[in-house]
Amino acid sequence: MLVYCDPKTWPENPEKLNLPEGWFVAVGVHPKHALDFGDFYFDRLSRLLDSPAVAALGEVGIDCSEGAKSFGIQSSTLKWVLELARPYMPLVFHFRASGDNPQATDALYREVLGLTLDKVPNTLQSIHLHCFNGDEATVKLWSDAYPGTHFGFSSMVKGFGDRPKRGLRAVPGNRLLLESDSPHLLDVAGSINHPAHLFRVAEGVARVRGQSPLDILRSGIANGQALYRRK
């Protein structure tokens, strides 16, 4: 999936990107770009989501990694963007709490779930929680609220403590996704990342879940194809 989450770099026409077979596009507003979002971009985003080449709305969400000062504008922008949600099109969420605090992470997931339920009451909405690092209670909360919630895992699993490991183990096998998040994250071996390195993510996930990497890889691919209706 090719993700365009900076309004300034959205493609003019996603259908003319000439992507390789099997690739598709997501468009959204990363929370760090929330300040740039306005009426002009809202209208553009609405039109882009009508393109048959666009398969998802995202990334959208809340990112407190640079402090809480921008939380208000990020929250307002998220509420606004969620007005464009469509049940047949997955929402890709990006959540990051301030600091390395597992309790703050789980609290952020709970807070945004409440906001999402208010703006997107259709519980048939498909959801992809990108780079998920919540606990098992968070998995249950989102799954109960939106049964179509999928949980994505990247090379970040190599640094998981007990709490997010419990969350990873609690994810149903048919709701687990694998992510490279390239080029932003290094892969689990510390190399420059690429979607072709996804097997290394599968190995990291498999170690936590006590499964074979090949089974994890097969499940992740099948789940991604089903979620994005690309099979």
Task: Tell me the role of every PLM-derived stretch.
Residues 1-231:
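Mid-domain alpha/beta scaffold segments of enzyme catalytic cores
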